[in-house]
Curated annotation (Swiss-Prot):
This is Formamidase. One of its GO terms (biological process) is putrescine biosynthetic process from arginine. Belongs to the carbon-nitrogen hydrolase superfamily. Aliphatic amidase family. The lineage of its organism: Bacteria, Pseudomonadati, Pseudomonadota, Gammaproteobacteria, Pseudomonadales. The active site is at residues 61, 130, 163. It catalyses: formamide + H2O = formate + NH4(+). PROSITE patterns: CN_HYDROLASE. Its EC number is 3.5.1.49. Residues 15-257 form the CN hydrolase domain.
Length: 338
């Protein structure tokens, strides 16, 4: 499917998404965090000016906080804090949907790596805490809100995952299973992950008949180098549009969720998300609907264990300078209501 020349030729059923390859910041004070927030607010305005037909502007993971992995309380955000208020107001002012990243204060443990989808009236439509922090490098609390989906612009259904989440095929499958026709993936990845980034963005799309829109931070903060690499993939796994390494570029593409829905209903061969739960339906009525996967049954029972479990070297964050944790996992209540 064509990209509509980056949304310049918008079709009646199209959803135009911009992926912002935001320059990598390095804030260590509240003032620096606020300055970076204002930069993102300015980029929301730029998105609207540069493409009047854009429906949604997506910012990468770490777009406010950079890659320092600092958990300093003075630079953590909250859902009702000034940074989130400013981002919501920007969407409302410029009548555009936005996807934003925050490191969220957690009084019961380590901060959460969280993301929001805000509509063009400034309302939070989706709130997600990263399920799979990039261990052993990242110190964030494991997410505890599942994988939500929300109604998006122009009849789309959106899901949002963060960076390392996309390396687990179960994440994209859950997004699609809950009805998402477009999955957003925001990241701070650096160059060594480039190949894995591309093939997982494509496989996540193809195996779920879902369009994916993915973007990393971009450029250098003097220590780390993020890669940009904005990428749109169609539901058949083909790349529709992609960016390079130019910081602060907004890469745009028109997606067609109506064609995703059509494929999910009408495809026979490679309708994998349906066939996963209806194995061999040519031979048996409705297909086999059991669960033949040992790892799924074990995970559900709290007994997930690899044959080489005892030999795994990295099982905490000590190799990256973090203390061995003593707390067991316990979900943290959220004040946000859908």
């Amino acid at each position: 499917m064509a990209s509509g020349l980056g949304g310049l030729n918008k079709s009646p059923n199209g959803v135009v998404i911009g992926l912002a390859q935001l320059a990598l910041p390095d804030p260590h004070t509240r003032e620096a965090l606020w300055a970076q927030t204002q930069k993102v607010v300015g980029m929301v305005a730029k998105a609207r000016r540069s493409n009047p037909g854009m429906d949604l502007i997506v910012f990468p993971e770490y777009s406010l906080h950079g890659l320092s992995m600092s958990t300093a309380p003075e630079i953590m955000c909250s859902l009702d804090g000034p940074e989130v208020v400013a981002l919501r107001e920007a969407c409302k002012e410029h009548r555009i949907w936005g996807c934003f990243s925050i490191m969220e204060a957690n009084p019961q443990g380590n901060p959460f790596n969280s993301s929001l989808i805000v509509d063009d009236l400034g309302e939070i439509r989706l709130y997600y805490r990263k399920l799979h922090p990039w261990v052993p490098v990242e110190p964030w609390e494991p997410g505890d809100l599942g994988i939500p989906v929300c109604d998006g612009p122009r009849g789309s259904t959106l899901a949002l995952i963060i960076c390392h989440d996309g390396m687990f095929p179960e994440m994209a499958r859950e997004c699609a299973y809950k009805g998402a026709d477009i999955m957003l993936r925001t990241a701070g990845y650096t160059a060594p992950i480039r190949h894995s980034w591309k093939i997982t963005n494509q496989s996540n799309a193809f195996t779920n008949l879902m369009q994916t829109a993915s973007v990393c931070m971009c450029g250098s903060d003097g220590t780390f180098d993020s890669m940009g690499e904005a990428m749109f993939v169609d539901f058949d796994g083909t790349i529709m549009a992609e960016g390079g390494g130019r910081a602060d570029e907004i890469v745009c593409c028109e997606l067609r969720p109506d064609l995703v829905r059509e494929a999910r209903v009408h495809w026979g061969v490679e309708n994998n998300i349906y066939q996963f739960g209806h194995r061999g339906y040519v031979a048996v009525k409705g297909g086999a609907r059991d669960c033949p996967y040992t790892y799924m049954r074990d995970l559900t029972a709290g007994q997930y264990r690899l044959p080489w479990e005892n030999d795994v070297v990295h099982t905490d964050g000590r190799s990256c300078g973090f203390a061995t944790p003593e707390r067991e996992f316990k979900p943290t209540p959220s004040s946000w209501k859908e």
